[in-house]
Amino acid sequence: MKKKLLYIDHSFHNKTKSAQFLEELLCSAYDVETCDFDPYDKNPDIIFDSFTGRDFDVLVLFQVMPNIKKLKEQISFKYPVFFPMFDASGGLDDAFWEQYREFNIINFSYSLHKRLLKLGLSSYYIQYFPKPIETFDFGDPAHVFFWQRVTDLGIDMVEKLLKKNSYNRIHLHRVLDPFQTFRSPSRCIADKVEYSDWYDTREEMLKDVESYAFYIAPRLYEGIGMSFLEAMAMGRCVIAPNFPTMNEYIVHGENGFLYDYHYPKSIRINNIDRIQKNAYEYVKEGYAQWEVNKYKILDWLEAPLGGSVPLPMEKQKKEFIIKKYTFCGKFPLLILESKPYKRYYKLFGSWCVWKCKRKGNKIIFYLFGFIPVWKASYW
């Protein structure tokens, strides 16, 4: 008889099917009950009322962060497990993670895994790869696919990045995350843009992506990065911000391109066929490893708290970017320090005059680093 597992997942995955791989893996070893959690609901925790008094061997939270205290009051479980996403929790304060000290945490982001180990949490790391297509063609090198999901990464950024390259069509998929604002193309490229608002099936969208040589990653940060990984699995040339998880897969100029989001410059792209082939082969090799390693997840679900030692990476990537403006090349005048969902502007190298920080679905801007002066919706 299989043990009982309660799987609490983001309701958005009902549409995207991007978490289906994990649910199938869990079902191979457990009797799984699913719960769709909508963090944008006014009272999201009410969904747990239907599970009040129930007992489970394992509780799995995937990409959702409900009220842990209330969860414990309503549901009994022996082994709690949390799959965090870098885009949602990578920039949260250390204090946030205290509530997960009794959890085994399974990370798809190496950057977040390292941080949680430093906090003394029980963290495990595994890198996901989707199944590559059996054969691929290179697509049209003059065509670009871009899905705008967030306000801060719009068609204007695509125009900057491709300024030095020749293209005649941009497919703009305008389905945004909650609380985001669409950006219209400039007059210079408006006649090159075609639009879509949604696809009946995920397969229809992937078929369109496959016909374009270029794929612009849709967000600044990712949890796993399913969208750009599926593009790489089809041999697309992915252009992405130099942030996790994109920079944990993409090596600039080898199997894709990374850019500085705060100081974007046009990327001169040559030998695109080589980039596409490298991307495809990279995912093909990674998928073979994933098929072997994915069963470790089942071992980690009920493992004693402790976690694993960080795995060495071939190429370590910076977790944040620092820009310095100096006088005579020596004396610091202004320093811009950028971390996930945090930016600091410091005068003379130490005096913090401006900081913005994400809390929930808001970004709060602080004067002198501690006086809140403005609040805006983020996603």
Where are the language model's segments positioned?
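Short alpha-helical segment that forms part of, or immediately flanks, the ligand-binding pocket
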Residues: 206, 229-233, 247-248
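N-terminal pre-catalytic "stem/leader" segment of glycosyltransferase-like enzymes
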Residues: 1-67
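Short hydrophobic beta-strand element within catalytic cores of glycosyltransferases
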Residues: 237-240
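Conserved catalytic-core segment of nucleotide-activated headgroup transferases in glycan assembly
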Residues: 16, 131-202
